[in-house]
Regions:
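Motif-centric detector for short Cys/His coordination patterns
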Residues: 1-87
Length: 87
């Protein structure tokens, strides 16, 4: 089928600080500091992700959908919960 996205996407490493994924020839780091909802996830849950389109990733076991740009530039996407912080 024309237009299908078929590049390789895989989990390459997990540490206590975050994890790395390979999208085609680009490796991206997702630090738990910026993506805290992955911190309690199992390796199985983190590694079971889909790359349905060039700009989107989806973790069905966790029901997490992320823009690839939010991983490349987390400072542009304030995703970290501010619960408990005082102004």
């Amino acid at each position: 089928m024309l237009g299908n996205h078929i590049s390789v996407a895989e989990l390459t490493n997990v540490s206590k600080h975050g994890f790395w994924i390979l999208l085609g020839d680009e490796e991206l780091h997702l630090p738990f500091e910026h993506f805290p909802w992955f911190k309690a996830a199992t390796i199985e849950q983190i590694s079971a992700f889909e790359w349905p389109s060039e700009g989107r990733l989806y973790w069905p076991m966790l029901d997490i959908d992320l823009s690839v740009d939010s991983i490349r530039h987390p400072e542009r996407f304030p995703l970290v919960s501010r619960h408990g912080r005082h102004s």
